[in-house]
Amino acid sequence: MSKSTDRINLTNQFLIAMPNMADPTFSGTVVYLCDHSERGALGLVINRPTDIDLQALFSRIDLKLEIEPLLHVPVYFGGPVQTERGFVLHDPKDGNAYTSSMSVPGGLEMTTSKDVLEAVASGTGPERFLLTLGHAGWGAGQLEEEISKNGWLTVEADPKIVFDVPAEERLEAALALLGINLSMLSGEAGHA
């Protein structure tokens, strides 16, 4: 079998950090994988809100946000890579995509251009979105290695967990997709 036919693609999957996660940056996280290929992987942590809200962030980038329900929506820590850059995970846009959008096959869209934020500020943006600062990134083979060492569980992503479940409940909700709860997980890997 060739390498291209036996490799898995985890795009549009949740990565759920196991209790024995070696990197404390990802302890207790759920990551939505936007892209996974032989070159590496890119994802956004969806359950780690920051102290920054949309009103504060929009003010920093000279955008006026006056939509009351959005003012105090938290901005999330998306991962340790490019933490000064915004990444917006949202439902696919009808018609033309935003300037820098990546469509996730079978899933959502991720946009990095300011036009999506301008649309949010004007009330014409995506109805459901999650804004992160930074992203999680893995080089070629790095994520697969972490999974093989029991660092992550994987499960097909459910957009309802991204947008409709409170941040503090997303880890348990993602685990429930696998039929397990957090108390069932151990930091020890089994060996035969």
UniProtKB/Swiss-Prot annotation:
SUPFAM superfamilies: VC0467-like. Pfam families: DUF179 (PF02622). One of its GO terms (cellular component) is cytosol. Transmembrane segments: none annotated. InterPro entries: AlgH-like. HAMAP family: UPF0301 (MF_00758). Belongs to the UPF0301 (AlgH) family. NCBIfam families: PRK00228.1-1, PRK00228.1-2. This is UPF0301 protein Bxeno_A0649. It comes from Paraburkholderia xenovorans (strain LB400).
